[in-house]
Structures are given as C-alpha cells and as structure tokens.
Amino acid sequence: MTNLIKNVKDAFNSVLSYAPTHIVQAPGRVNLIGEHTDYNDGFVLPCAINYQTVVAAAKRDDNIVRVVSVDYGNETDEFDITQEITFQENKMWSNYIRGVVKCLIDRGYEFKGADISVSGNVPQGAGLSSSAALEVVIGQTFKELYNLNISQAEIALNGQQAENEFVGCNCGIMDQMISAEGNENHAMLLDCRSLETTAVSMPEDMSVVIINSNKKRGLVDSEYNTRREQCEEAARIFGVKALRDVTIEEFNAKAHELDEMVAKRARHVITENDRTEEAAKVLASGDMKRMAVLMAESHASMRDDFEITVSEVDTLVDIVKNVIGAEGGVRMTGGGFGGCIVALVPPMLVDEVKAAVEELYEAKTGLKESIYVCQATNGAGLVL
C-alpha cells in the first residue's frame, strides 16, 4: 500500500498544487465459500484482502468535488454537489464517485466539497471487487473529512445503492460490506437476508492465494440470469420466499417434483448455505482438514449441480489440491464461467503451489495464470 499512498499524494500535490490532509483506504475481497447464495437470501464467507483502493483528500470551503484518477493518467472530474449530479458516459470511472456522493446526499448527510486523488491495485476484471472498494473508500473519505455519523454498514449500503441505481449495475451487498467492515486475520460470515455480520477468526498465518485462470468469461450475464430464475422457480414450488428457507431434508422429500435442472440448481444453493455456516465454525476452530472438505464439496457442487465452472478452472483447482492435500482448501470463487480460484494455503506451501501452477497450468490449458498471495486484512478506514 506504500506505493499507492505515495502515488495519490504525489498526484494530489502536482495536479491540485497543495498537500492532502487525509489518506483513506478500502480493500478488495475474495469469497472463501458461499457461491450464488447471496441472491437466495443465504450466507457468504468473504475476507478483505491486502489489495486496496487509496484516496488522498482534503476539505473544500465550497460545494465543488474535484477528483484526480491516478490510474487514468491523472484524468480529472469536477462537479457541484448543490446541482444535479449527472452520469458521465465518457468517463466511466467517475460515475462510481458521483454515485456515492449523490446517494450520501439523498440519505440526508450534509457536507461541503472535497479535493480527492484516487488509485488502486485491486486487479480489475478478476472478480475481486475493485468497484466496491472504490465506492466504499469514497464513502469512508466523506465520513473522515466531515465526521459524518454514518456506520460502516451504511457506507456499504450506500455504495451498493450507487452501483445499482446510479452506475446501473446490479450487485448484492457482500462486496461493499466486507470492504467496509473487514477485520485483519478474520473472514466475515454475512447473512444476506438480515445483513447481520459475524467476524470469524482465521488461522493466524494462513495465506489466501487467489489465482486468476485468465479464461475469458463468456455468457456470464445470460447464464447468471438463468440460474437466478431457476432458483426463484424452485423457491416458488417450495412455497418459500427464497431457497434459504428450505432444509436439505425438505428438498430431498420433494426433489422428484422438480424439473431435473431446477432440482440441481436448488440442491447447490441449499447445500452451499449449510456448508458456509459450518465453514465459519470450523475456520474459527482452526480445523483446516474439515475446511478443505467443505471447500472441495463446494467446488464439486458448482461444477456438477450449478454447472458454472469451466475446464480451465477445474484444472487449476486440481493442481493446487494435489499440492496442499488436507492442509488447506481450494475452490472456484466468484460468478463462474472463468475467473478465479481461491485457496487457503499454509505459508510453507505457498511457493510449492506457485511452482506447480506455473509449471502445469499453461502446459495443460494454453493460458497463463495470474497469482495473488494475500492476507485477510482490515476493512475501510483512515490510514494517515
């Protein structure tokens, strides 16, 4: 993060010609287990990772917000918070910031303008929530600058609202919530219905290894929508609000009444919720052997019942599994059809995992992976 801090300070100084008063950060995240459970009112178990979006900022006496984007060649955006805040077709990055500020105002928070420079190292397009980190860091920045009486949960909800309503991209609450509320060396069990969060301690030195398959993700939106519709259909047949409300016993008793495809989709969600709740308990107790089993079962369920993995991702999981055995867990993470795997790896096996993947993955698939070795880190807050 040191480089990011230097970059945002330097950009602030050079473009705005004075020094910032505050440095604020918000992290990206990875979901350890609980996939496609969020829109079924279920449970997820993400952790914040030490790839962040960082802001240098200072208050202004007027109502102007000026933003410098370091990652877009110090491109700037400027808007007046007392005027209508509009969507910028030709400057997509700025809409996340405009949306967050607009939603804060709509929620009744009062503040004046700000000068902001922003940069991040959360890999974009890898499903590690670079957009949520940006939304949360902007909310956090206004909280810090103006001592706003806003909870971390509301900063998260405000960011989600900005993405859904202003940017126009549907997302659940997980990404913003873990970015806003994460704890070092902890994952977070999130109940996607009540939004209740529980910090779950992780083995102190466990590495969180994220490997991007770099498989281009085709069909994601249409397949995602189909899965969602199938889950909603299953919930209707069971007469419940969401699949969260169906036990595996109830499912087994009625599975024969469901269309075979719908039954497979429902079985994944119902068993994944059970796995996620159990994973929170076994992770906290340090039982990595059981965690390894739960993550393996999650991956198999995504592959066979939810059918969202691809051969390249399955290959990556197999390569890592062969190295770590029962010492850690590995599974696909994210929406599917490409993307990343996540592995909980004891530190002494990290180099071995990297070596095996570098030796075997490209040879088997023709694709070159990207590897990120992370730790579970704190959520958004003031750095300086």
Curated annotation (Swiss-Prot):
Site entry: Transition state stabilizer: 29
Pathway(s) of this molecule: Carbohydrate metabolism; galactose metabolism
InterPro entries: Galactokinase (IPR000705), Galactokinase_bac (IPR022963), Galactokinase_CS (IPR019741), GalKase_N (IPR019539), GHMP_kinase_C_dom (IPR013750), GHMP_kinase_C_sf (IPR036554), GHMP_kinase_N_dom (IPR006204), GHMP_knse_ATP-bd_CS (IPR006203)
Record flagged with keyword Lyase: no
Gene Ontology CC terms: cytosol
List of residues binding Mg(2+): 131, 163
BP-aspect Gene Ontology terms: galactose metabolic process
Molecular function terms from GO: ATP binding; galactokinase activity; magnesium ion binding
Domain of life: Bacteria
Compartments, record wording: Cytoplasm
Keywords: ATP-binding, Carbohydrate metabolism, Cytoplasm, Galactose metabolism, Kinase, Magnesium, Metal-binding, Nucleotide-binding, Transferase
Catalytic activity: alpha-D-galactose + ATP = alpha-D-galactose 1-phosphate + ADP + H(+)
Function summary: Catalyzes the transfer of the gamma-phosphate of ATP to D-galactose to form alpha-D-galactose-1-phosphate (Gal-1-P).
Protein name: Galactokinase
Native species: Aliivibrio fischeri (strain ATCC 700601 / ES114)
Lineage: Bacteria, Pseudomonadati, Pseudomonadota, Gammaproteobacteria, Vibrionales
